[in-house]
Amino acid sequence: MSWSVEKKREIISTFGRNVKDTGSTEVQVALLTERIDHLKHHFLKHKKDHHSRRGLLKMVAHRRRLLKYLKENNMLHYTNLIRNLGLRH
């Protein structure tokens, strides 16, 4: 599965406030979650790809910070987002 423009548009339309909303916290978390899932499948085949693993860890940390920000500022959006994405928090 490649990271396509159509997939990005689909995520933005699902989690964004409008079509051009790419900067909201919800959209950023959803996009990061999609990239993290893509890399998880990559590591099933390429176990020794440590360079990409470091990038994965950075993405997970960034997503965690964004979720913390969202939880502190808008609990309703936070709970809806983690329910829709299937995250454990």
Curated annotation (Swiss-Prot):
The keyword Phosphoprotein does not apply. One of its GO terms (biological process) is translation. One of its GO terms (molecular function) is rRNA binding. GO terms for cellular component: cytosolic small ribosomal subunit. SMART domains: Ribosomal_S15 (SM01387). It comes from the Bacteria. Keywords: Ribonucleoprotein, Ribosomal protein, RNA-binding, rRNA-binding. InterPro entries: Ribosomal_uS15 (IPR000589), Ribosomal_uS15_bac-type (IPR005290), uS15_NS1_RNA-bd_sf (IPR009068). Signal peptide: none annotated. Belongs to the universal ribosomal protein uS15 family. One of the primary rRNA binding proteins, it binds directly to 16S rRNA where it helps nucleate assembly of the platform of the 30S subunit by binding and bridging several RNA helices of the 16S rRNA. Forms an intersubunit bridge (bridge B4) with the 23S rRNA of the 50S subunit in the ribosome. This is Small ribosomal subunit protein uS15. It comes from Blochmanniella pennsylvanica (strain BPEN).
